Amino acid sequence: MSRSAAASGGPRRPERHLPPAPCGAPGPPETCRTEPDGAGTMNKLRQSLRRRKPAYVPEASRPHQWQADEDAVRKGTCSFPVRYLGHVEVEESRGMHVCEDAVKKLKAMGRKSVKSVLWVSADGLRVVDDKTKDLLVDQTIEKVSFCAPDRNLDKAFSYICRDGTTRRWICHCFLALKDSGERLSHAVGCAFAACLERKQRREKECGVTAAFDASRTSFAREGSFRLSGGGRPAEREAPDKKKAEAAAAPTVAPGPAQPGHVSPTPATTSPGEKGEAGTPVAAGTTAAAIPRRHAPLEQLVRQGSFRGFPALSQKNSPFKRQLSLRLNELPSTLQRRTDFQVKGTVPEMEPPGAGDSDSINALCTQISSSFASAGAPAPGPPPATTGTSAWGEPSVPPAAAFQPGHKRTPSEAERWLEEVSQVAKAQQQQQQQQQQQQQQQQQQQQAASVAPVPTMPPALQPFPAPVGPFDAAPAQVAVFLPPPHMQPPFVPAYPGLGYPPMPRVPVVGITPSQMVANAFCSAAQLQPQPATLLGKAGAFPPPAIPSAPGSQARPRPNGAPWPPEPAPAPAPELDPFEAQWAALEGKATVEKPSNPFSGDLQKTFEIEL
C-alpha cells in the first residue's frame, strides 16, 4: 500500500494496527472489532438490571410441591390457571398417543383457547371461565379413564372421560400458564386416588356383601347401606353399644301406673327407640343395620271425613256412594225400587204466572206436569161446541191444571230416562191405535157411501128440529158443508197448537239434556190433547157418528114423514204431505225467542225412540 501511495503522489494516511480477532469470532479478521471500554461497562450494567430467569428444575426434582398439591386436592382448594383448548371425540379410552393426537388436532383447528381456572378435588374436575366465571366443564372423577401430560409440549395436559349421555370417549385438552403439564397430571391422579379411597372406606363401613350364584344370574345382598353418622366412627359405634346393652339387660314387665307417673304415649316415642329398647336385634341382621322408621298408628287412624258440605251426608245426596259402582246395589237404585210411590209431596216450584212465560219455571213446570200425568189415562176429546162460536174458529181445549212434581230422589236422572222410555212406548201404542182407527174410518166411510141412511161428521150435525107442530121446509144441511175444493177447517187449525206438527225426523248430534227436554215437551203436548194426534197422522175426516136423536126423521103432524136428508158430498181425501205444506204456508212467521228456556219455543225436531 505504501508503494502505491507513493507512486500516486497523494497524501499518506496513517496506518492503524488492529488487534487480532478472537479465535471463535465468525467472519474475516477485518470485521472483528472490540468495543471501547465505556460500551462494555454499560452492557454489564444493563444485564445487572434485567430479571434473571430461574434455573429450570424438572418436576421429578420437586417432590415437596407435589405433596402440597395432594393436601390441597383432599381439601378441595387445588387450582391451576390454564387455557382450555377444547374437547374432541377419540376412539380409545387410554393412551398417551391418543391425548397427543387430540392436542394436535385442536391446535390445528385454530380455535381460540379460553383463559380459565382448573379446580381439582376428590369429587371432580371443574373448569371455570376466568373472565365471566361461567362453568365450562364439570367432570366427575369416576368417569375419567386416563390422564397424561404431553411429551411434545411441556405445558400441555389432557384427560379422557366417558360422556354420560352419548356414551362416547371425549378428550379434554389444556395448556398450563404457570405450571407444567406433569404437575396438572399429578394433581388429577391424586384426586382419583382420594376418590377411590373414599369409595373403599364407604363400602367397608356399610358392610354390604353380595353373594352370586353359579350362573351369575342372581345374587343375595347382605347388610344395609344406611348409616347414622356419615364418616364419624364414634357415632357408628354408638348404636352397637346401645343394642348390646339392651340385649344384656333383663326385660322387666311394666307395673301398674302410679298416680304421679305419666307414661309416654306411643306417638311421642320414636320408632328407633322402640326397636332399641323393646325388641332385641335379630340374628340375621348385621350390626350396622338400622330399623326403618314407621309412622305411629295414631297418625294413621282416620280422624274423620271433611264436613264442609253437610248436605252431602244426607240420605238423598246424589254424591253418597257407600258401595262400588254396581248398578243393582247402589243406594239410589235400592231407594228407587222401594219408595218410588208418589205421596203427598210439596211442589218444588210455583205455577208460572202470566208474565213469566219465557222463564225457566215454565219449562220446569211443563216437565213436572208431564211426569205426574204420565201414568194417567188420556182424557176424551172435547165435545163439539154448538154455541155462538163460528165454524172456522178452532175449539180451544181447557188449560191443563198445575200438578205438583214428584219427590226428588238421588236417582233423578234415571227416573227421567224411565219416564222418557214410558212416553216413547205410549206414543208407539197411540200410533198403532191411530192406524187402526184410520183403517176403521176408511171402512166406515166406504160403508156410509153405500148405506141408505146418510151420516155426517159431528162437526157438521144439523141443529135439532123443534118438537112442536109446524110445517116448514126441510133443514138446509148443505149450507154448512165446505166447498169441495176448500180444505176442512180442522186441517190447518189444530186445537191447542199454533203450528202444524212437524214430521218426526231422527236427529243426530244433540246432547242428552236436549233429548230429554224434547221428549218431555212432546209428552206434555200429546197427553192432554189426544185430538191433535189425528191431525198428525193424516188429514182424514173424523169417523162418522150417527146423528143426534133430536135430528132424526120424525113424523109430520099430518102423519107424513120428513123427506130423507140429502147425503153430504164426500170430502176429498187430502194427502198428509200436501196438508202439512198448506199449513206451513198459512202459519204466520213468529220471531224465534232469544231465551232458550222460554216456554213458547218452536219445536223443530222430535226424537222417536
From Swiss-Prot:
The modification Phosphoserine is found at residues 224, 228, 263, 411. The keyword Phosphoprotein applies. Keywords: Cytoplasm, Developmental protein, Neurogenesis, Phosphoprotein, Ubl conjugation pathway. One of its GO terms (biological process) is cytokine-mediated signaling pathway. Residues 1-68, 223-283, 372-421, 434-464, 537-609 are annotated as: Disordered. It comes from the Eukaryota. Residues 233-245, 409-418 have a biased composition (Basic and acidic residues). SMART domains: PTB. It is found in: Cytoplasm. GO terms for cellular component: cytoplasm; glutamatergic synapse. The PTB domain is necessary for the inhibition of MAP3K7IP2-mediated activation of NF-kappa-B. Plays a role in the process of neurogenesis. Required throughout embryonic neurogenesis to maintain neural progenitor cells, also called radial glial cells (RGCs), by allowing their daughter cells to choose progenitor over neuronal cell fate. Not required for the proliferation of neural progenitor cells before the onset of embryonic neurogenesis. Also required postnatally in the subventricular zone (SVZ) neurogenesis by regulating SVZ neuroblasts survival and ependymal wall integrity. Negative regulator of NF-kappa-B signaling pathway. This is Numb-like protein.
